[in-house]
Amino acid sequence: TLNTLLLNCMFASGQLKEGEMYDVDFDHQFIETEKYDAKPTYKKFLGYRPGVAVIDDLIVGIENSDGNTNVRFHQKDTLKRFFERFEQNGLTINRFRADCGSCSEEIVEEIEKHSKSFYIRANRCSSLYNDIFALRGWKTEEINGIEFELNSILVEKWKGKAYRLVIQRQK
């Protein structure tokens, strides 16, 4: 496949090395297009929305899906193919990072199998509002030039498994 060729080229050029640990970022990129097979996206334009895996500034996997489906649709399968390809090439995933489109039980279970740790941005959650409101000890951090306050709590979202939820807020 083209993703295999992509990885082979990165190994051949020395941009990736077998046996190394890497941080992987994953997101869906919305691409507006007027092609005949483009589908409406929730962003209100015709286009594609491939899932893209990135190590540093290198695209290490890209897979298209219908523009009008939810970003979680078959995301577990896409990630499983990416992870298996990485592992077949001797790459170890240290940290995996994704946005709230990856915050579902089946996707998190797949990510857990293939990475040392992971960070997934959660949706706003009204059921946790009181717990978050009562938090003390917020730390100020600058992220991409924007100042945020950060804190965390343990939550049991699925089947009694506890995950640390990091909360960020802007003053």
Segments and roles (model prediction):
Residues 22-30, 57, 93-103, 118:
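Short, conserved catalytic/metal-binding motifs centered on acidic residues
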